[in-house]
Amino acid sequence: MSKISEVVQRARAAFNSGKTRPLQFRIQQLEALRRMIKEHEKDLAGALTADLHKNEWNAYYEEVVYVLEEIEYMIKKLPEWAADEPVEKTPQTQQDECYIHSEPLGVVLIIGTWNYPFTVTIQPMVGAIAAGNAVVIKPSELSENMANLLATIIPQYLDRDLYPVISGGIPETTELLKERFDHILYTGNTAVGKVIMMAAAKHLTPVTLELGGKNPCYVDKDCDLDIACRRIAWGKFMNSGQTCVAPDYILCDPSIQNQIVEKLKKALKEFYGEDAKKSRDYGRIINSRHFQRVMGLMEGQKVAYGGTGDAATRYIAPTILIDVDTQSQVMQEEIFGPVMPIVCVRSLEEAIQFINQREKPLALYVFSLNDKMIKKMIAETSSGGVTANDVIVHVSVHSLPYGGVGNSGMGSYHGKKSFETFSHCRSCLVRPLLNDESLKTRYPPSLAKMTRH
């Protein structure tokens, strides 16, 4: 038996012992996780700085705070969510007790990713712990400083058998996927998501896949362009564009393209100064391979702003592309970098058609003062989530499920949805062992009963 198999088997044995069943145990583990985060805030920030050039402020407000809020929300709501839920009865079951009982699935595997290596690894773990599962954590090896830190500190605070951390790269993940889990949650790209799903199918293991896509951002002529562009620039260029729900490209009328460029430039200079490379708030690309990939997407494009990079530091300047050919590579794959293409459309209907001709995105954004236009965009398109007149913030609302649709993923989590994702809703009926006379019509022989109808 391999070391990874031993770790998974220990987690299953610990789960089978029943120790996760009591709510008090789950809450104690969540409280320990909260304590771990608060006592290691500086270490977490240091790892994020080393991996992605995030400063302490960005590390806290882009990652740590969301997990702390999720833990508080879970602890507060867990007794309510875990309680048996009575359901409506049929005429034949009026004397019975009918309810839904939430039970843990078993051993859950969470495979994190590198762009928000703390949040996307630990936030789903919060829900899995709350639901009473054992959780095997596999951080991304690309954000190696965060991966090493989590492998060090998690065993110091949480039950070591129930919540192990597996370090390593593709070989270790491949070995993990040979094991039988009761649920797998993966965050990453669509190609790997398909590999995860194929591996899970061998054991009929359900999956939650948080993938990606090209998130459209439609800007109506009838809106405050200063506010719109400031909000778009914030969401697009935070973490150097390496955010799965960042706006990937802008759709707008040709008449406002130049205004959008100028207002984006103004916002970028406000955020990061004349030279973003010198800004403590501006991130870096995770590694050289991704640096080369993003730089390659700009080849042959009309650059209105930025377009430069430094391979030695993996810095790519905030970049705006105009008059973009929709058949070019930059419009065929998720950019996942600080490059914003602008595509011109002449109407809302054309924008909707453009969006619907492509794979369903993880997020969709629309800026307009016209509520009917916003409702039309929502009604006639499909995406994992929507924010109108801002970007990204729907992900921060614990009561809204976070997930994709189609090529951008399946399943969702956050808040109550996390508890539901990592629970089995068990249908329960408890009948009194009395008054069998009322059930006599169901018993054979049936011939005499049939002649009466």
UniProtKB/Swiss-Prot annotation:
SUPFAM superfamilies: ALDH-like (SSF53720). It comes from the Eukaryota. CDD domains: ALDH_F3AB. Keywords: Acetylation, Cytoplasm, Lipid metabolism, NAD, NADP, Oxidoreductase. It catalyses: an aldehyde + NAD(+) + H2O = a carboxylate + NADH + 2 H(+); octanal + NAD(+) + H2O = octanoate + NADH + 2 H(+). The modification N-acetylserine is found at residue 2. Coiled coil: none annotated. One of its GO terms (molecular function) is aldehyde dehydrogenase (NAD+) activity. The active site is at 210, 244. The keyword NAD applies. Disulfide bonds: none annotated. ALDHs play a major role in the detoxification of alcohol-derived acetaldehyde. They are involved in the metabolism of corticosteroids, biogenic amines, neurotransmitters, and lipid peroxidation. Oxidizes medium and long chain aldehydes into non-toxic fatty acids. Preferentially oxidizes aromatic aldehyde substrates. Comprises about 50 percent of corneal epithelial soluble proteins. May play a role in preventing corneal damage caused by ultraviolet light. Homodimer. Belongs to the aldehyde dehydrogenase family. This is Aldehyde dehydrogenase, dimeric NADP-preferring. It comes from Canis lupus familiaris.
